[in-house]
UniProtKB/Swiss-Prot annotation:
It is an enzyme of class 1 (oxidoreductase). Pfam families: Aldedh. Its EC number is 1.2.1.41. It comes from Marinobacter nauticus (strain ATCC 700491 / DSM 11845 / VT8) (Marinobacter aquaeolei). This is Gamma-glutamyl phosphate reductase. InterPro entries: Ald_DH/histidinol_DH, Ald_DH_C, Ald_DH_N, Aldehyde_DH_dom, G-glutamylP_reductase_CS, Glu-5-SA_DH, GPR_dom. It comes from the Bacteria. Belongs to the gamma-glutamyl phosphate reductase family. It is found in: Cytoplasm. One of its GO terms (biological process) is L-proline biosynthetic process. NCBIfam families: PRK00197.1, proA. Pathway: Amino-acid biosynthesis; L-proline biosynthesis; L-glutamate 5-semialdehyde from L-glutamate: step 2/2.
């Protein structure tokens, strides 16, 4: 069977399964999640064997140490997958919830009901634990899913897929409710993103090149973010202690995440006092600073930033630093260079904080908090399938509710329109 025919078959099966999953009860979907957790626990040896094949092939193909680390399924990571399934099972189910019910002057009642999206396509790279994370969230929210992982994790993903199928079967749900693409042919991605008759939304998780390609070529709506160029702005009304603490955490708590600060903006009124203190903290953590001319004049021995630095998502111990002309300058810089992911202001002035919240056009905007909090778990969503910087449908961390839509429901008692 060629790739196009294979993907069409997966799509047809997913569409049929999505109807059964959508009408299943919360208890049944939770049963499938818990049964999958048990299946993973029982299949540790099989998972380790499959993963070792991927790791061996990865070394032969010259994968770097960071990629191999993301690929590895350690015992602790299997534990985390199992615990993640149990946590998702414990989350409130958004499906079927009716909100905003009101009486209209005509006497009818109008409200909104949460419903599944249908079939969700997930395209991701490297990390096999994403297979479980994504499948569990899609299933809990009443959706079927087709998962296309990276070719480097094919054996691990197929071993996980067998556990998912076992969990679905034990709960009485169709095994085709979660399907992991078994071919490594890259044409499968092209087919998956151009099947609107079978797939309702695509969620890509990977590098910028992958997401740009999917955004350009997809004929299906895409939930995505391209970059995490996040800013912290230290206002002239900032508490210096808070400013130091938040800025250092936003950059150094983890370097390789999309919610890590990549550019630090400092108000010109406090730059002379705060920049040396900030530089000392960052240097102690071996962070390379790249500054504007005013920053270089204050600090002296740092690299001068170029235009590319203001656009950069380093994902590394490198930080761009700019002195700005007050709140106006900070907002102007952020709205020009930000990826609309997460930006934060450090200030004790409520009016200035409100203006920042209103005028900065990002999916998460913060006051006196580290950008590292931009995360579904930290927001109380329980878990997330990704972060969206788009403005239609979901925006920000996308949890269970973001994997549903709404339909209007109307109740009457023989009402007719006159």
């Amino acid at each position: 069977m060629d790739v196009a025919a294979y993907m069409t078959e997966l799509g047809q099966q997913a569409r049929a399964a999505s109807r059964e999953v959508a009408r299943s009860s919360t208890a049944v979907r939770n049963q499938a999640l818990l049964a999958t957790a048990a299946a993973l626990d029982a299949a540790r040896s099989e998972l380790a064997t499959a993963n070792s094949k991927d790791l061996e092939r990865g070394r032969e193909n010259g994968l770097d140490s960071a990629m191999l680390d993301r690929l590895e399924l350690t015992s602790q990571r299997i534990d985390a997958m199992i615990e993640g399934l149990r946590q998702v099972a414990a989350l409130p189910d958004p499906v079927g919830v009716i909100t905003d019910m009101t009486y209209r002057p005509s006497g009818i009642q109008v409200g909104k009901m949460r419903v599944p999206l249908g079939v969700i396509g997930i395209i991701y790279e490297s990390r096999p634990n994403v297979t479980v994370e994504a499948a569990s969230l899609c299933l809990k929210s009443g959706n079927a899913t087709i998962l296309r992982g990276g070719s480097e994790a094919i054996h691990s993903n197929q071993a996980i897929a067998r556990c998912l199928k076992q969990g679905l079967s034990e709960a009485g749900l169709p095994e085709t409710a979660v399907q992991v693409v078994s071919t490594t042919d890259r044409a499968a991605v092209g087919e998956l993103i151009t099947m609107p008759q079978f797939v309702d939304v695509i969620v890509p998780r990977g590098g910028k090149g992958l997401i740009e390609r999917i955004s350009r070529d997809a004929r299906v709506p895409v939930i995505k973010h391209l970059d995490g160029v996040c800013h912290v702005y230290i206002d002239s009304h900032a508490d210096p202690e808070k400013a130091l603490k938040v800025a250092v955490n936003a950059k150094t708590q983890r370097y390789g995440t999309c919610n890590t600060m990549e550019t630090l903006l400092v108000d010109d009124e406090v730059a002379e006092d705060l920049l040396p203190l900030l530089a000392e903290q960052f240097r102690s953590k071996t962070v390379e600073l790249r500054g504007c001319r005013r920053t270089c004049a204050i600090l002296g021995d740092i690299v001068e930033a170029t235009e590319e630095d203001w656009h950069a998502e380093y994902l590394a111990p490198i930080l761009a630093v700019k002195v700005v002309d007050g709140l106006d300058g900070a907002i102007e810089h952020i709205n020009r260079y930000s990826s609309q992911h997460t930006d934060s202001i450090i200030t004790e002035n409520y009016t200035r904080a409100r203006r920042f919240l209103t005028e900065v056009d990002s999916s998460s905007v913060m006051v006196n908090a580290s950008t590292r909090f931009a995360d579904g778990f930290e927001y109380g969503l329980g878990a997330e399938i990704g972060i969206s910087t788009d403005k239609i449908h979901a925006r920000g961390p996308v949890g269970l509710e973001g994997l549903t839509s709404q339909k209007y429901v109307v109740f009457g008692d023989g009402h007719i329109r006159t």
